[in-house]
């Protein structure tokens, strides 16, 4: 008869614990074997099925070592400050501040370039020793191309220009017109007496010249005719003074028969005795106000 060989599954669980110790290093192991170990509680329910038995072995290992031999936890690397990075030449490339339109070359120089929106191309501005010089070169090019809309690093763009609305100056057309045209314009009547807008009807209005009837002129009578006497007129003067001296005192000047010589003295023919002496005349009586005397 052949003997049946029973197979079993053997597993080892090891746990290591390290503790500090002043003396020599020592190791303590605790081993436990479980021949009837099961993976889960469901294995006990399936009794009808033939399942290979499991054997588990638990090993606990305790190590006693010195404090110097104890492994230290890994420390986190601290980031260097920009000041410390500036002291070290190797870290200078990594701590450079980035500016708009500036790039650093592998050999350490700084290049500046800008994009031209009109041509849609990049303009090369040159290579500079420092990043600040390259940034200033970019700012100048941006202000020259974009004006007040430029985005700069250091330089301040110019202010936007203010749009001033200038008042429109009226256009005055001066035309020289003849006397006939000005007379015609004066005859044009306005539609409204209060209207301030003048307009011309030269294209639509026809001018007609109509004869005007002249009124009968009024002729004044010839008061001073070349007649027999100098004062002869249709209006009879007041006979108080003129009739008395007309015929007797005044000579007939306009008479053709009378010839006056240069040596003729008219004062001889004019009797002054009729008037009297001038010193005897009371002139003040003529200028007195009779109303005040009353």
Swiss-Prot record:
Ranges where the record places region Disordered: 35-54, 64-87
GO BP field: cotyledon development; cytokinin-activated signaling pathway; ethylene-activated signaling pathway; leaf development
Keywords carried by this UniProt record: Activator, Cytokinin signaling pathway, Cytoplasm, DNA-binding, Ethylene signaling pathway, Nucleus, Transcription, Transcription regulation
DNA-binding region extent: 98-155
SUPFAM superfamilies reported in the protein's UniProt record: DNA-binding domain (SSF54171)
CDD domains: AP2 (cd00018)
Expression triggers: By cytokinins.
Signal peptide annotation: none
Localization of this protein: Cytoplasm; Nucleus
GO cellular component, one term: nucleus
Chief location category: cytoplasm
Coiled coil: none
PANTHER family: ETHYLENE-RESPONSIVE TRANSCRIPTION FACTOR CRF5-RELATED, SHN SHINE , DNA BINDING / TRANSCRIPTION FACTOR
Functional summary from the UniProt entry: Component of the cytokinin signaling pathway involved in cotyledons, leaves, and embryos development. Probably acts as a transcriptional activator. Binds to the GCC-box pathogenesis-related promoter element. May be involved in the regulation of gene expression by stress factors and by components of stress signal transduction pathways.
Family, similarity comment: Belongs to the AP2/ERF transcription factor family. ERF subfamily.
Name recorded for this polypeptide: Ethylene-responsive transcription factor CRF5
Organism: Arabidopsis thaliana (Mouse-ear cress)
Gene name per UniProt: CRF5
């Amino acid at each position: 008869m052949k003997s049946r060989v029973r197979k079993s599954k053997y597993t080892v669980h090891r746990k290591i614990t390290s503790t500090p110790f002043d003396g020599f290093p020592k190791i303590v192991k605790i081993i436990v074997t479980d021949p009837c170990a099961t993976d889960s509680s469901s294995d006990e329910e399936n009794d009808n099925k033939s399942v290979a038995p499991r054997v588990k072995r638990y090993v606990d290992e305790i190590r006693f070592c010195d404090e110097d031999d104890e492994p230290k936890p890994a420390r986190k690397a601290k980031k260097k400050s920009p000041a410390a990075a500036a002291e070290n030449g190797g870290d200078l490339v990594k701590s450079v501040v980035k500016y708009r339109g500036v790039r650093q070359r592998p050999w350490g120089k700084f290049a500046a370039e800008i994009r031209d929106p009109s041509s849609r191309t990049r303009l090369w501005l040159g290579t500079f020793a420092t990043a600040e010089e390259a940034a200033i070169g970019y700012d100048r090019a941006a202000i020259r191309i974009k004006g007040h809309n430029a985005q700069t690093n250091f330089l301040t763009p110019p202010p936007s220009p203010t749009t001033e609305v200038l008042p429109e100056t009226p256009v005055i057309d001066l035309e020289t017109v003849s006397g006939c045209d000005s007379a015609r314009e004066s005859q044009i009547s306005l539609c409204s007496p209060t209207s301030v807008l003048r307009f011309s009807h030269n294209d639509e209005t026809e001018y007609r010249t109509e004869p005007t009837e002249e009124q009968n002129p009024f002729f004044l009578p010839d008061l001073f005719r070349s007649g027999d006497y100098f004062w002869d007129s249709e209006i009879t003067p007041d006979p108080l003074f003129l009739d008395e001296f007309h015929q007797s005192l005044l000579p007939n000047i306009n008479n053709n028969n009378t010839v006056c010589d240069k040596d003729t003295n008219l004062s001889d023919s004019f009797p002054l005795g009729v008037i009297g002496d001038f010193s005897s005349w009371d002139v003040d009586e003529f200028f007195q106000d009779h109303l005040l005397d009353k």
